[in-house]
Regions:
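Metallo-beta-lactamase
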Residues: 78-81, 86-92, 96-108, 123-179, ...
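Residue-level marker for buried hydrophobic side chains located in beta-strands
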Residues: 57-59, 101, 127, 200-202, ...
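Active-site metal-binding loops of divalent metal-dependent hydrolases
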Residues: 10-11, 61-64, 105, 132-133, ...
């Protein structure tokens, strides 16, 4: 079985450093993620294309372009990459995509899933998400309500292109559905099993960047930060034992790395690499 992994860049955006690192003091996180004069750090929106057999599977879709200029002005979009440009660079269009895995339905992950005309952007694709996350997004709590914009996903149900997946299920036989509940309920962190024996975990917002490997580096956005810490410790342990690669959706500088214990017996990112090396 031939499997190809390709990074799909959809542009960058800025978020408050304190929001991205929670209670961790700025003196610690600013060394790794320098902030500007407004305390904003620049973040990638890096999706992943998995080609296996006749299937072309896109994991997440970026922020899209449906919202108002005022909305986007809060996030200082930058960079010359876009979803369409990145697909075109590898000779594809949205119509070539057969599956879309939505790790969760926050706007920076699902914005590209639906067009400005509120139709499914990937007209021939099935969209995979957990039912837990779907129900959570459609009945949001006050803390997350601003991140769940129904115009980004509501039409997927009306068009009949949704597929609810369960933990442990496999998509195209190689993408294992792992779920986490600390950041938001029912978030998928897909684990890709390559024919070579290598495994790649798409970190979503459990590991938005390599700086978030440490269990106490938890975003203020997370609805259950203590749960995130527990989930991350367990994932760090398994990733180390099984020698996984971690793919970072929001890390501006690094696509992926391994996780290992350092001399202080703490988990940290090591052996940074590009996903191309796995093809």
């Amino acid at each position: 079985m031939n499997v190809k992994l390709t990074t799909i860049h959809t542009g960058n955006f800025k978020l408050d450093g304190g929001a991205m690192f929670g209670v961790v003091p700025k003196v610690l996180w600013n060394k790794m993620n320098p902030s500007d004069e407004n305390n904003l750090c620049n973040w990638a929106m890096r999706c992943l294309l998995v080609e296996v057999g006749s299937r072309k599977i896109l994991i997440d879709t970026g922020i899209g372009d449906k919202q108002s200029d005022k909305f986007f002005s809060h996030y200082y979009l930058n960079g010359d990459q876009s979803l369409d440009k990145s697909l075109a660079y590898v000779g594809l269009t949205k119509d070539d995509i057969t599956d879309v895995i939505l790790t969760h339905l926050h706007f920076d992950h699902v914005g590209g899933a639906v067009t400005n005309e509120l139709t499914a952007a990937f007209s021939k694709a099935i969209y995979h998400v957990t039912e837990t996350q779907w129900n959570h997004a459609n009945n949001p709590n006050p803390r997350e309500k601003a991140s769940f914009l129904k115009e980004n996903f509501e039409t997927l149900q009306y068009e009949g292109v949704l597929n609810f997946v369960e933990p442990g299920e496999k998509i195209a036989d190689i993408i294992e559905v792992l779920t986490c509940n600390g950041h938001t309920l029912g978030m998928i962190t897909p684990l890709i099993h390559l024919p070579s024996g290598e495994k790649v975990l798409y970190g979503a917002d459990l590991y938005p960047s390599h700086s978030h490997i440490k269990s106490n580096f938890v975003m203020a956005y997370d609805i259950q930060p203590l749960v995130t810490m527990i989930e991350k410790e367990a994932m760090n342990q398994r990733a180390t034992e099984e020698n996984w690669w971690i793919y970072y959706e929001h890390d501006l500088a690094h696509e992926m790395s391994k996780i290992a214990l350092n001399e202080k017996n703490q988990f940290e990112a090591m052996n940074f690499a590009s996903v191309d090396m796995l093809n």
